[in-house]
Amino acid sequence: MIKEFINIIESMEGITDDWFRTGAFETYKHPTPIHYKTAIANGTVNTLEGPVDYQAGHKIITGPKGEQYPVNPQKFAEYYDDNKDGTATPKKIHKHAKLADHDGVVKASWGNLNYKAGEDYIVRHGAGDYGVVKKDIFKQTYDTTNDKSI
């Protein structure tokens, strides 16, 4: 997942805003607190989608399966309410998501994130801003009421 918050450069496989026009549904993250640490130095974390670089000050979030992913401080403040105890609660922000219909790579400025057809959801946070979420994690952390694929 940011695994969950990625600015797309462009994917040869066609993940663009237009890709979401058919088959996407409205969703939001459940308000279940997540755990995080603040990076004190630059580094790399191995996300479920591949290695991702981060900088000092980025928040390293631990997901429901123990997976980790970095989020820059601005995105963190935009998408989470900091509980000031090493946890944060996702804000209820409506987004669009779609189950990947092809294998590919989301190319972010800090690394490539792989996704597989039928195994990963692509979440559209805003124009040109996407995240990749494993299917089982998506079902645990996002509202799936409007998902016609399940």
List PLM regions with ranges.
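A motif-centric signal for short, conserved binding hotspots located
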Residues: 3-64, 73-129, 136-140, 144-150
